[in-house]
């Protein structure tokens, strides 16, 4: 019985989410807009590990420069790029973006619902690992 209970999180069902209250879509767009404007602190504040997220964003900005940083995230707002799926496992979400301007490459963002609000999911978890596998599956299907 204990083994079954320990394995239960691994058996969590993935489900597709439509736009609405169960979706992390609005939070994702807010984060992307902050990043496209170079507003690292505001974007990092929408994470479940804000200090670490800020450090990662700052390091990336410092490595590519301010303008390239803004372009990198601003591209998600470009009309050729679109959100093609939102997959949930428990409170966690994977948003899958098709980047048309990058040859249809797929990019993923991870969010988690905390106290009724979605934030960037920067804390490792079993469900997040499973969502990474889902993203790999989407990418493999896209190639075939």
Label every model-predicted segment.
Residues 15, 89-90, 102-106, 114-144:
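Low-complexity, intrinsically disordered terminal/linker segments enriched in charged
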Residues 35, 39-42, 64-67, 76, ...:
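Short, flexible helical or helix-coil boundary motifs
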Residues 1-7:
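Bacterial N-terminal signal peptides
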Residues 31, 43, 111:
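Hydrophobic pocket/interface hotspot
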Residues 38-53:
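Short, well-ordered alpha-helical segments enriched in acidic and aromatic residues
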